[in-house]
């Protein structure tokens, strides 16, 4: 596939810790329910998964935030649970309760029965969306592909949906570690194939979302989450279309383990808001770029407070290469789009070199 040349490579340059004219910015969940035009598209699609599975609609909602704001990257509109769904677990959504699976994975027989999905055929709708979005971007900004981490996917597969304490999976980790490893290895193989297919179809950077890795002890994190993200990083296509394909790891509540994460060979770490970005830069900034890390709840505050927090984070990071501004987690549905605009424009204005 041949695509238009990239006009704005600020995001990719920052990921490689090269100098940029200002700090690039994008937001996790930037195509989402806070935008009225997204809500209209979702209603038109009929359901969230119908929206994900229609390449034209997925493309439309991916581009919506770029029409409103001066963002430096687009991120594929999809869901982290596409892989377990393709494994036959029956993903569905209950209003107000989030994602659920019709089948759970808790026994040796359950794990043995899990197929490794073929990204091109079993997840072809995602690849159609990637190539459609990349074509429609026409070189405006880079396209980010993504996946959930093996550990995070496993939490949903074993618990059957969202969980506060992950008791079934944690019991497996401590009572039957070999069973947990067998499942996580299958997931790591699946994620590697899935992200490589996204890269072949046009993703110019990829992010691994380890939303629940921070729920683990330090030892368990290294053994059951980081180990499998390392396996994925080792197996990814790192050059495509004559350019490096950067990899971002994001473990929510992973601030204690940045050095171990940076040692995986990834290009950048996503940070949540619980860590000072200046401290993070002093710890690992010579190895990786850093992405983050404003508390999404600041977007409910006044415009003046939003600008002040942007300035604080920029000042804390300092005049160094390798910063991509983002929120510390996804933007939430009740945020006023005008407040998101204040945030993004503050980053653009206050970070000009």
Swiss-Prot record:
Associated pathway: Porphyrin-containing compound metabolism; protoporphyrin-IX biosynthesis; coproporphyrinogen-III from 5-aminolevulinate: step 4/4
Matching SUPFAM superfamilies: UROD/MetE-like (SSF51726)
GO biological process, one term: protoporphyrinogen IX biosynthetic process from glutamate
Site location (Transition state stabilizer): 79
Molecular function GO terms recorded: uroporphyrinogen decarboxylase activity
Quaternary context: Homodimer.
Name the UniProt record assigns to this protein: Uroporphyrinogen decarboxylase
Natural source organism: Alcanivorax borkumensis (strain ATCC 700651 / DSM 11573 / NCIMB 13689 / SK2)
Name of the coding gene: hemE
């Amino acid at each position: 596939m041949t695509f238009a040349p990239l006009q704005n490579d600020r995001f990719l340059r920052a990921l490689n810790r090269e100098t940029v004219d200002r700090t690039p910015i994008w937001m996790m969940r930037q195509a989402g329910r806070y935008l009225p035009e997204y809500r209209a598209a979702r209603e038109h699609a009929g359901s969230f998964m119908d929206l994900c599975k229609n390449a034209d609609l997925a493309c439309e909602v991916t581009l919506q935030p770029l029409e409103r704001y001066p963002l430096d990257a687009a991120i594929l509109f999809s869901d982290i649970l596409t892989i377990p769904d393709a494994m036959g677990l029956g993903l569905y959504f209950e209003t107000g309760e989030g994602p659920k699976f019709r089948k759970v994975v808790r026994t040796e027989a359950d794990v043995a029965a899990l197929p490794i999905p073929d990204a091109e055929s079993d997840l072809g709708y995602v690849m159609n969306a990637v190539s459609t979005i990349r074509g429609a971007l026409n070189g405006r900004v880079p396209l980010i592909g993504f996946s959930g981490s093996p550990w995070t996917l496993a939490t949903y597969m074993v618990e059957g949906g969202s969980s506060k304490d992950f008791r079934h999976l944690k019991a497996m980790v401590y009572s039957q570690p070999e069973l947990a490893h067998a499942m996580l290895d299958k997931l790591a193989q699946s994620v590697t194939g899935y992200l490589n297919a996204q890269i072949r179809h046009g993703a110019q950077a990829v992010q691994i979302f380890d939303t629940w890795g921070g729920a683990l002890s330090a030892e368990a994190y290294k053994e059951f989450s980081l180990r499998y993200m390392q396996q994925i990083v080792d197996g990814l296509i790192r050059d495509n279309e004559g350019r490096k394909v950067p990899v971002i790891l994001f473990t929510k509540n992973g601030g204690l383990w940045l050095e171990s994460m940076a040692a995986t060979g990834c290009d950048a770490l996503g940070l949540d808001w619980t860590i000072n970005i200046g401290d993070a830069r002093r710890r690992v900034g010579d190895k990786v770029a850093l992405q983050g890390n404003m508390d999404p709840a600041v977007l409910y505050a006044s415009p003046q407070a939003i600008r002040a927090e942007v300035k604080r984070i920029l000042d804390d990071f300092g005049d160094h290469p390798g910063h991509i501004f983002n929120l510390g987690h996804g933007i939430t549905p009740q945020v006023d789009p005008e407040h998101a605009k204040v945030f993004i424009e503050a980053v653009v204005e206050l970070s000009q070199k």
